[in-house]
Amino acid sequence: MRGTGTHLIAKNRKAFFNYHVEDRLECGIALEGTEVKSVRAGHLSFPDAFAEMRGGELWLKNVHIAEYVHACSFAPNPDRMRKLLAHRDQIARLKRKVEEKGYTLVPLEFYLKAGRVKVALGICKGKKLFDKRAQIKARDNARELSRSLCERHH
């Protein structure tokens, strides 16, 4: 979803290891006060985050946005639920997909687009243990091959 004029803030690498990403959706996120400055500084953590539907709206859970250090005393709860901003038809499409067995909504990346914080939300299906092992084995084999090629040339 990301195009030119975007700046990656954080990427959920754990999500790409634990899930097969079937589709992506760009969403806005409703942030309060100094949360935007904290996100811009990269002070967020979301390895176990997910999105859920409530009352026809998308809500992001388990995202920790640290308090902005240079702010005054008011700071929102760092672990609160945050509303995701998407069009009604996009939410309906996501709802149909999530109602299928095994699908979940996982935030893949946070990035800036035209000065706004955006979330790339993935429609994901969990990987089986043997899928993860195969991925690790393929990665290790590729690493070993590149090492042997480097040694051969030096």
Curated annotation (Swiss-Prot):
Gene designation: smpB
Gene Ontology molecular function, alphabetical: RNA binding
Keyword tags: Cytoplasm, RNA-binding
Family in the record: Belongs to the SmpB family.
Protein name: SsrA-binding protein
NCBIfam families: PRK05422.1, smpB
SUPFAM superfamilies tied to this protein: Small protein B (SmpB)
Gene Ontology CC annotation, any one: cytosol
Stored InterPro entries: SmpB (IPR023620), SsrA-bd_prot (IPR000037), SsrA-bd_prot_CS (IPR020081)
Compartment(s) where it occurs, according to its Swiss-Prot or TrEMBL record: Cytoplasm
Record organism: Treponema pallidum (strain Nichols)
Disulfide bridge map: none
Domain of life: Bacteria
Function: Required for rescue of stalled ribosomes mediated by trans-translation. Binds to transfer-messenger RNA (tmRNA), required for stable association of tmRNA with ribosomes. tmRNA and SmpB together mimic tRNA shape, replacing the anticodon stem-loop with SmpB. tmRNA is encoded by the ssrA gene; the 2 termini fold to resemble tRNA(Ala) and it encodes a 'tag peptide', a short internal open reading frame. During trans-translation Ala-aminoacylated tmRNA acts like a tRNA, entering the A-site of stalled ribosomes, displacing the stalled mRNA.
